[in-house]
């Protein structure tokens, strides 16, 4: 006899064969063995299946006799048939008392017990009473394969898969009953549910020996087993599929699902078309929803629409799963009208529908609509909470995501790894050091901090929350058995964000040599961003060449990163070339090229590109409109009326509500063209309290136009607000310093330090001979420090001769005039430009310098004089864009 190894499983639970009297169900007289069929029919027809009703119908019950004649035997059979009917009704109405009543009469039977016992087992398990089912089972003198199968399948339905396995092994050990096809289907289902795939494979061998492989139900269950097994592939499923002599729709669906899971959507569609050619087979809702989920790129867009048409033709548009899949499909292809139309036409919705709608609205940036859908969900679960929280993170609403996470904790909603990952991501968006430490501690306390996904998210969070030391410690202690590629990518991005791009490049080279970094679209995109931040064009070009050779250039996000990289490296020609050679563009592609023109302060070209965008009917996003409004600062002529029209019509034309970023950009445009009063009125008419960034935009414009009256009012507003970010603390401190309130300035700095914030020091750097030479104010760490300082002294003297006058108003320290000049003369940008002049004698080649913050007014004036003294073009990029200093003039026209 062929058996299966079961030494690893627990023994079957012991139930005594003889049931103690106190455990026996109470015998009701209503269910006596001698009930006439018409009486049972009247009983079963009653909608109230309570024992009291049964008792009322049984007043004429008679006792059993020792012998039966033919008529009495027929009566017993009729009564047993009535029991079956009662069991069906009790299962339908979930009335366990009737089942127990049948059970009581069952115990009095001397014959015909097995068939009724099997029905009792099934009914008890359907009602969720496994112990009572076992009591019936052990009372059977000769359980059949149906008895065992009823227990196995019932236990599986009740998530008692281990108990189901025990029953199967008891059956095999007894050796009196052989499993049938339904037994194999039930036990394979249990194996899949508890991930006992190796056991399932052993059972596969038993199925082959038992000759049940020709059963379509058994073969379908085997395909499902191999489909769910991570150690198997779709080839194993296909092999089984090819061996099935007769297939049903479930067979086709299983193999299609397996191909979709492995990303072989084209092969799945080929099988789908083959399925349609087989006579007698029609697709069902599972087929369509599975194939729709595989439509993730533009190459299968038409196929997805074809599936939609097929669903309409064959009448599957009322199926929930099909509608849910269609909503997911159209949201991937940015067709919100279709999504909303499908949702409105649905007769019913479920949790999946709401989750798909929340995800769709969030992907379109329609946060309020997503929140409204969530609010209308009556039975919220972990999945709906996770969808909303992930959507908040995707749209940059870290604080809202954290509040939702807190709500989940208070309501006792079950947390998953995805929930915690989103909460950690939200901390990174908020950039609150203390909050990040609390979430980090929460993950450690509940033992999830070492989950690979959460661990990577925690490292990334540390890089965003002023905790680079913690991030470096986590990276150094990264488990050797885990892939470190994502962690490496995160910490490289962290270095770039925290003003340490040189460290990012150094780590990139080291991990690349140690083969700890896998170069894919994500890592290449990140390192291109670092190259752009550094202005390291040569390295960016090498990455570009590698991407071409590796076949990554078709990736849109990589193309967008290349545009951005070349733009930040002052190479707009190559940025335009990349844009023109891309096979397809998304809104980010257009945004990247518009941003390129703005960095060069070329507003007219940016607006021309915006016109092309409108001609192609490409829908802008929030960032697009921010960039386009900003472009009006850099036009050759005043185009304020067009800018004003665009700003005021954002909601009506593009369905985008103006945000703080749009107000900030518009105020800068008004300030640039000298309309300070209108800018102030715009701020005062904002529907919400203006944020510091908007007020700062107006304050900068007041500096440019020397308008002290408006500046005082704006400064007063800024000082009345509570700072929330490091930049807001620094601005408030600087305002106090500029006004001579040194003590108040220091108090603000102290409060900033208490919150764990620190100011990123001003830093300038230059790329020379493929090396990054970095400087901060009064830096003496460079190997050529003496030559640099000597050269700078000479440059200062020469500039003083031709009219340069140091402007000590830009020194915000409480020191004497002599020290203020000393501070001014040794700013990081001056040191970097001096090194650039000394290290390059090529007169026709510009000196290229990068600075991480806005260039101060004194340095700006100084570089105009240097361009005259040394007869060299100086190209400097700061946070506002590029400055081209040529012959004593700057491309920004002193308006930056």
Swiss-Prot record:
Gene3D superfamilies: Tetratricopeptide repeat domain. Residues 770-800 are annotated as: Type E(+) motif. InterPro entries: DYW_dom, E_motif, Pentatricopeptide_rpt, PPR_At4g14850-like_plant, TPR-like_helical_dom_sf. Residues 801-896 are annotated as: Type DYW motif. It holds the Pfam family E_motif. May play a role in embryogenesis. NCBIfam families: PPR (TIGR00756). This is Pentatricopeptide repeat-containing protein At5g03800. It comes from Arabidopsis thaliana. The lineage of its organism: Eukaryota, Viridiplantae, Streptophyta, Embryophyta, Tracheophyta.
């Amino acid at each position: 006899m062929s058996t299966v190894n079961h030494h690893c499983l627990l023994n079957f639970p012991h139930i005594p064969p003889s049931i103690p009297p106190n455990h026996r169900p109470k015998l009701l007289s209503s269910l006596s063995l001698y009930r006439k069929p018409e009486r049972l029919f009247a009983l079963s027809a009653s909608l109230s299946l309570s024992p009291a009703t049964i008792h009322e119908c049984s007043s004429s019950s008679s006792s059993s006799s020792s012998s039966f004649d033919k008529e009495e035997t027929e009566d017993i059979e009729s009564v047993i048939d009535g029991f079956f009917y009662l069991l069906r009704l009790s299962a339908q109405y979930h009335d366990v008392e009737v089942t127990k009543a049948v059970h009581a009469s069952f115990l009095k039977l001397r014959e015909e017990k097995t068939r009724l016992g099997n029905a009792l087992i099934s009914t008890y398990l359907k009602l969720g009473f496994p112990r009572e089912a076992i009591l019936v089972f052990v009372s059977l003198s000769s359980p059949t394969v149906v008895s065992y199968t009823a227990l196995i399948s019932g236990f599986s339905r009740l998530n008692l898969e281990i108990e189901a396995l025990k029953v199967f092994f008891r059956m095999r050990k007894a050796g009196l009953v052989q499993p049938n096809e339904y037994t194999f289907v039930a036990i394979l289902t249990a194996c899949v549910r508890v991930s006992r795939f190796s056991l399932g494979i052993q059972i596969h061998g038993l199925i082959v020996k038992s000759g049940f492989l020709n059963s379509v139900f058994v073969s379908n269950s085997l395909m499902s087993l191999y489909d769910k097994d991570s150690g198997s592939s779709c080839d194993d499923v296909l092999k089984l599929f090819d061996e099935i002599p007769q297939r049903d729709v479930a067979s086709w669906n299983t193999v299609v699902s397996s191909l979709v899971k492995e990303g072989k959507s084209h092969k799945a569609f080929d099988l789908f078309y083959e399925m349609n050619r087989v006579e007698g087979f029609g697709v069902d809702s599972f087929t369509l929803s599975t194939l729709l989920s595989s439509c993730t790129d533009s190459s299968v867009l038409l196929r997805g629409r074809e599936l939609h048409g097929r669903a309409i033709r064959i009448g599957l548009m009322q199926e929930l799963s099909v509608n849910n899949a269609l909503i997911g499909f159209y949201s991937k292809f940015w067709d919100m009208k279709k999504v909303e139309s499908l949702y409105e036409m649905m007769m019913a919705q479920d949790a999946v529908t709401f989750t798909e709608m929340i995800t769709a609205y969030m992907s379109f940036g329609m946060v309020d609509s997503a929140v409204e859908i969530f609010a209308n969900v009556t039975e919220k679960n972990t999945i709906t909470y996770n969808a909303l929280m992930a959507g908040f993170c995707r749209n940059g609403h870290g604080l809202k995501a954290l509040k939702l996470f807190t709500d989940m904790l208070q309501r006792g909603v079950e947390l998953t790894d995805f929930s915690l990952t989103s909460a950690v991501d939200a901390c990174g968006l908020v950039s609150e050091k203390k909050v990040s430490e609390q979430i980090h501690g929460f993950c450690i306390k509940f033992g999830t901090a070492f989950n690979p996904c959460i661990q990577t998210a925690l490292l990334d969070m540390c890089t965003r929350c002023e905790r680079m030391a913690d991030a470096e410690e986590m990276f150094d202690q990264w488990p050797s058995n885990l892939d470190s590629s994502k962690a490496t990518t995160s910490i490289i991005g962290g270095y770039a964000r925290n003003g340490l791009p040189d460290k990012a490049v150094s780590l990139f080279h080291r991990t690349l040599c140690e083969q700890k970094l896998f170069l894919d679209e994500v890592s290449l995109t990140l390192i291109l961003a670092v190259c752009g931040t550094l202005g390291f064009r040569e390295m960016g070009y090498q990455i570009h060449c590698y991407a071409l050779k590796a076949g990554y250039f078709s990736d849109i996000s990589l193309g967008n990163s290349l545009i951005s990289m070349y733009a930040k490296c002052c190479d707009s020609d190559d940025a335009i070339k990349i844009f023109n050679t891309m096979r397809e563009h998304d809104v980010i592609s257009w945004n990247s090229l518009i941003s390129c023109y703005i960095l060069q302060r070329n507003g007219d070209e940016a607006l021309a590109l915006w016109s092309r965008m409108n001609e192609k009917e490409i829908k802008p996003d929030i960032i697009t409109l921010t960039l386009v409004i900003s472009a009006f600062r850099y036009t050759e002529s005043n185009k304020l009326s067009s800018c004003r029209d665009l700003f005021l019509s954002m909601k009506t034309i593009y369905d985008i509500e103006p945000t703080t970023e749009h107000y900030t950009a518009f105020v800068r445009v008004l300030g640039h063209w000298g309309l300070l009063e209108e800018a102030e009125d715009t701020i005062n008419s904002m529907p919400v309290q203006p944020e510091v960034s908007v007020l700062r935009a107006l304050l900068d414009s007041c500096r440019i136009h020397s308008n002290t009256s408006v500046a005082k009012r704006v400064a007063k507003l800024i000082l009345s607000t509570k700072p929330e970010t490091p930049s807001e603390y620094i601005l408030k401190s600087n305002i106090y310093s500029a006004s001579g309130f040194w003590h108040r300035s220091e108090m603000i700095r102290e409060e900033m330090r208490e919150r764990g914030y620190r100011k990123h020091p001003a830093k300038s750097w230059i790329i020379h001979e493929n090396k990054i030479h970095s400087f901060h104010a009064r830096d003496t760490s460079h190997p050529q420090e003496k030559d640099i300082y000597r050269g700078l002294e000479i440059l200062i003297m020469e500039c003083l001769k031709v009219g340069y006058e140091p402007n000590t108003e830009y020194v915000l320290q409480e020191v004497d005039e002599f020290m203020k000049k000393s501070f001014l003369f040794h700013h990081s940008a001056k040191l970097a430009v001096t090194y650039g002049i000394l290290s390059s004698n090529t007169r026709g080649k510009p000196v290229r310098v990068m600075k991480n913050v806005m260039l101060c007014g004194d340095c700006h004036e100084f570089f105009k004089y240097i361009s005259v003294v040394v007869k060299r073009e100086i190209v400097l990029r700061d946070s506002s864009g590029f400055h081209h200093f040529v012959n004593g003039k700057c491309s920004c026209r002193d308006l930056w």
